[in-house]
A protein has these predicted regions:
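Acidic-basic catalytic patches of nuclease active cores, encompassing PD-(D/E)XK
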Residues: 1-26, 40
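Structural signal for conserved beta-strand scaffold positions within catalytic alpha/beta enzyme cores
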Residues: 23, 48, 76-78
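Beta-rich catalytic cores
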Residues: 31
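Conserved catalytic cores of phosphodiester-cleaving nucleases, focusing on short active-site segments
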Residues: 35-37, 43-53
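Short strand-connecting beta-turns/loops that link adjacent beta-strands
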Residues: 40-42, 81-82
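Mg2+/Mn2+-dependent nuclease catalytic core
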Residues: 52-70
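Nucleic-acid nuclease catalytic cores
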Residues: 68-96
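Charged phosphate-binding loop/patch that engages nucleotide di/tri-phosphates or the phosphate backbone
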Residues: 101-123
Length: 123
């Protein structure tokens, strides 16, 4: 993870003590999301972290393929550095996110709303 994504990860971890997180650093399975979460409803989910300076959110072809193959319980959390806004997107909209960037409507906006959504996510 890049330096800004590492800081973002620590911010998420601090704000979600009720979620058990596993940080995934895997160079052999390209495209695997950054985080595996386990919430209070006994559900597993993955989160890809992105930090951006502008409207564009960039992904590797492997990351796009992962989210296309795994459309459920996969998420992308994006932090815009200038505004400090945090948005959560479902993995199944990754192609739209690539095309539209942060103009795409998120399923949740704001760090607290994003974290709360993941905490109470059900199957």
């Amino acid at each position: 993870m890049a330096k800004n994504e590492s800081k973002f990860w620590h911010e998420i971890k601090r704000n979600t003590p009720q979620i058990t997180w596993t940080r995934i650093e895997n160079s052999s399975a390209l495209g695997t999301p950054d985080l595996l979460g386990y919430n209070t409803n006994s559900n597993f989910f993955t989160v890809e972290l992105k930090v951006t300076k502008g409207n564009k959110v960039t992904f590797s072809p492997h990351q796009i393929a992962f989210h296309m193959r795994h459309p459920l319980n996969t998420f992308i959390m994006v932090k815009h550095l200038a505004s400090r806004d945090v948005k959560l997107y479902e993995g199944k909209v990754i192609e739209e996110l690539v095309a539209c960037g942060l103009k795409l409507d998120a399923c949740r906006s704001g760090l607290d709303a994003c974290c709360s959504y993941l905490q109470w996510l059900e199957a």
